[in-house]
């Protein structure tokens, strides 16, 4: 894949090109611009409006060409607010699509859709930039080998493993631990895979973006003293931004991730929160451009827009981009065109459960609702597959028995069912795990558990080897050896109390 890197200064290119047009019409965030005959900009070219408003304040608005209308006019969508613009203002054709800074200089910083830093930490090195519109990697460049992306999180690796270079949907309401799970994944990919992460905040609340940034600084994911040692770059296009910015901010984040994959040859985690807002912004832009709406009022190009973004997220022979996308489901309707189109691209789903969070089991990943296309014997191996299936069967049986237990109590169950319940409760607790990024809040050190250790632990619980241990010993530990050590400590404590 050709990385089209430019090292030009935008001001120099303005002076060189001087392809000037004038604003002919403004409708909200959409501008019609007239250019001289034979000087029409290309689709997706960046246009810059510079001037002063009626109060003498400087205006600097970047737009993206979306349509060529004829009569030497183009229609462009603004990437920032259009207040203060008026007809007749000069518009400069930059001659290229939007380009954003890429590489190590982006780590630890917050950018907007244009690749401008918005964290008041000074300018960013823009000698290496890359256009946000690119083709997906060619078929011959793809790495077609199916391999698991080990996260070090037991419940994910065992029951709904992530595919290296795959796409994962993250489902969960407010307050069930999405942010902490995201931060732990960012931390683990940096430590175990030497990789980096890019976080794309697409159309979500500014407060949430700010909270995430503060928590990342607190947990060490962003290193304030030495930004180069940070593990993540942040790109935000929040709810208050115009639809053009919300529609393109995902591509800005993806472009930064592609550089780490293709040039630095690293494994990259790309977070998109929220993929539904990307579709929603596309729908708004589509209506503003006058396109005929499709089903439920969505844009007619919904599948194309989603495919263009998702096909660039993949493994190549150099590195991989594994994407975790938070999915908002409007009115809990999974048949809505936005989530339905997203599902077609997902390799795995991680569903967070409020019930588990209420029990204090973190990460609150629902072991029965979360799925993965990777959980097949030919991919993960017979041992992993069998262990995962047995764990699910045990938990499913426990779920079925809960009504009986609530009405009649445990004593009314058969001996076999009582054993199943005891093991299921141990499994449920063993699926919890202390996180590195939560150390500052909980005081207990984080644990990274390798896949082989995870499988060994659950096999031993299922075999009945630890039927005599108290279930509390399995709560918030790393591997199975820590659980046995905790059981010994609990036994000693109870003896001392006596």
UniProtKB/Swiss-Prot annotation:
SUPFAM superfamilies reported for this sequence: C-terminal domain of alpha and beta subunits of F1 ATP synthase, N-terminal domain of alpha and beta subunits of F1 ATP synthase, P-loop containing nucleoside triphosphate hydrolases
Residues with PTM Phosphoserine: 13
The keyword Lyase is annotated on this UniProt entry: no
Residues holding ATP: 172-179
PROSITE patterns referenced in this protein's UniProt entry, alphabetically: ATPASE_ALPHA_BETA
Chain positions found as Phosphothreonine: 6
GO molecular function: ATP binding; ATP hydrolysis activity; proton-transporting ATP synthase activity, rotational mechanism
Function: Produces ATP from ADP in the presence of a proton gradient across the membrane. The catalytic sites are hosted primarily by the beta subunits.
Family (UniProt): Belongs to the ATPase alpha/beta chains family.
Name under which the protein is recorded: ATP synthase subunit beta, chloroplastic
């Amino acid at each position: 894949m050709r990385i089209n890197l430019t090292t030009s200064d935008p001001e120099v290119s303005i002076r060189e090109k001087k392809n000037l047009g004038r604003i002919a019409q403004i409708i909200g965030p959409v501008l019609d611009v007239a250019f001289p005959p034979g000087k029409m900009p290309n689709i997706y070219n960046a246009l810059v409006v510079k001037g002063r408003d009626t109060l003498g304040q400087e205006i600097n608005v970047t737009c993206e060409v979306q349509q060529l209308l004829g009569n030497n006019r183009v229609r462009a969508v603004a990437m920032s607010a259009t207040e203060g613009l008026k007809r007749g203002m000069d518009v400069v054709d930059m001659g290229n699509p939007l380009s954003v800074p890429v590489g190590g200089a982006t780590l630890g910083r917050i950018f907007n859709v244009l690749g401008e830093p918005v964290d008041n930490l000074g300018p960013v090195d823009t000698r290496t930039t890359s256009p946000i519109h690119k083709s997906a990697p060619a078929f011959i460049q793809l790495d077609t080998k199916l391999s698991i992306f080990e996260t070090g999180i037991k419940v994910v690796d065992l029951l709904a493993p992530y595919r290296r270079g795959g796409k994962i949907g993250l489902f969960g309401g407010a307050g069930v631990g999405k942010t902490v799970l995201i931060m732990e994944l960012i931390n683990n990919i940096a430590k175990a895979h030497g990789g980096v992460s890019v976080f794309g905040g697409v159309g979500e609340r500014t407060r949430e973006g700010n909270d995430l940034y503060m928590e990342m600084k607190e947990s060490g994911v962003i290193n304030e003293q030495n930004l180069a040692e940070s593990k993540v770059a942040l790109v935000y296009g929040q709810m208050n931004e115009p639809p053009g910015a919300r529609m393109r901010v995902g591509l800005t984040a993806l472009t930064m991730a592609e550089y780490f994959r293709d040039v630095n040859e690293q494994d990259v985690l790309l977070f998109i929160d929220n993929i539904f807002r990307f579709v929603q912004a596309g729908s708004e832009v589509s209506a503003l451009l006058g396109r005929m709406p499709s089903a439920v009022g969505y844009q007619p190009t919904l599948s194309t827009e989603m495919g263009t973004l998702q096909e660039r997220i993949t493994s190549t022979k150099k590195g991989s981009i594994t994407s975790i996308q938070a999915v908002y489901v409007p009115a809990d309707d999974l048949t809505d065109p936005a989530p339905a189109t997203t599902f077609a691209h997902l390799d795995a789903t991680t569903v967070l459960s409020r019930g588990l969070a209420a029990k204090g089991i973190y990460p609150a990943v629902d072991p029965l609702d979360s799925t993965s296309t990777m959980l097949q014997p030919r991919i993960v191996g017979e041992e992993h597959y069998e262990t995962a299936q047995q764990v699910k069967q045990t938990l499913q049986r426990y779920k079925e028995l809960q009504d009986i237990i609530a009405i009649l109590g445990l004593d009314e169950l058969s001996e076999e069912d009582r054993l199943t319940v005891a093991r299921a409760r141990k499994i449920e607790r063993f699926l919890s795990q202390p996180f590195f990024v939560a150390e500052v809040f909980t005081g207990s050190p984080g644990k990274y558990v390798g896949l082989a250790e995870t499988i060994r632990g659950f096999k031993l619980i299922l075999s009945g080897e630890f039927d005599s241990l108290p279930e509390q010993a399995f709560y918030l530990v790393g591997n199975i050896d820590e659980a046995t050590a905790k059981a010994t400590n609990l036994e000693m404590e109870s003896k001392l109390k006596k």
